[in-house]
Each structure stands twice: as C-alpha cells, then as structure tokens.
Amino acid sequence: MMKKSAFLAVIILMFCNACSIKGSFQGLYSYYYKTKSQDPLLLIVPDTSTSLCEINKPDTPRIIVINGSILKECIKTNNKAVVYLWAPKCKGKFCYSLNLLQQECDTRGVALYIVAEYYDTQLMQINYKINKPISGIDVEYYNSNRTSKYLSRFIYDLTLRKDMSGRLIYFEDGVFKKSFESIEEI
C-alpha cells in the first residue's frame, strides 16, 4: 500500500511538473502597469480641468484613462450614444471590429465611445478608423487591478446598475436605456 501511494505521488508530481499554462491572463487582470511601462506615451490621464468631451482623437493612438463618472458627463452631450466594452483579444460572436462598429454607429447617427476592459499595448497602438479616442478604465481610481472588480464599479458609475448583459450600452440624452450584445440592436 505504501509503495502504491509513493508511486502515485511520483506520477502526480511528474504530471504537474510537465504542465504549464500558455498565454496570458488578459481579461483577468488589467495589464495597466505593464502597458504603462511598455509605452509610457500611449496612456493619457487628463487633468481634472479638461473635459473628456474636449479631447479629440490624436493622429497617433492614445488611450484616455477615465472612470465611469467622467464618461457619463460626456455621454450627456449626445442625443444617442453607445459605449462598447472592448476586450482587445476577444474572438467571440459578439466581439466587433472597432472600424465596423464606428461605421454602424455613423449610419445610425449614434455617438460611439469605446472603453477597453483591459490594456493590451500591441492592439492599442493600432490607429483605428474611429471618431473618438479609445478610453481605458482607471484602475487606480477603482483601486483594483482585477478586471471583474473595476469593470463592475465602472459600469455602476456609468449606469447606476450593478449587473449588465452585453458589451454595448445604449444611452439617450445621457440616460441609460439598455444593454445588448448585437450591433443590429443599435
């Protein structure tokens, strides 16, 4: 019995030693600090005297670091607006090309605000054909580096709702109306 237990322990140790996790934990953590160190000029934290609405999309990609309350104030300046919670590495059915999403919103007369769920230096350095700069959630403001924690706080600040289904959040005259998955619902 003792030999069998020792043999089993050796097999388990060998199996665990041979296993490794490939890839990153993007989506679980923000990667804000990694992005900040890789490309310090990519992230812009606006001073409190500058309104998010006044920041134009620069010629080179820049990510505006914001919280939900700041974005909510800017959304109030539009008749219709959609916030897209962008997961840069998302490959699912309801993950959209930023360029396509901008075209759809332009066709429907809806302002588009893109907010990255987490930071990805490589995909954030692309110069997308969008009207407004991409925003990133301020993890220091929300005092968390875990995506689920700061994202739920951001959404609450934006909509005053605790739970949300869908990556697209729709507003009329600054008031939250609904959230949805499909761009056809815009």
Where are each of the predicted segments found?
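Positively charged n-region of N-terminal signal peptides that target proteins for export
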Residues: M1-S5
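C-terminal motif of bacterial Sec signal peptides marking the signal peptidase cleavage site
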Residues: F15-A18
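N-terminal "domain-start" segment that seeds a small globular fold
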Residues: G23-C74
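Short active-site neighborhood of thiol/selenol oxidoreductases, capturing the structured segment around
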Residues: K72-L100
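Structural microenvironment flanking redox-active thiols in thiol-disulfide oxidoreductases
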Residues: V83, F94-P133
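Short, internal strand/loop/helix patches
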Residues: N127-S165
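A short, hydrophobic beta-strand/beta-hairpin element that forms part of a small beta-sheet core
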Residues: M164-S179
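A short acidic/small-residue loop/turn micro-motif
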Residues: S182-I186
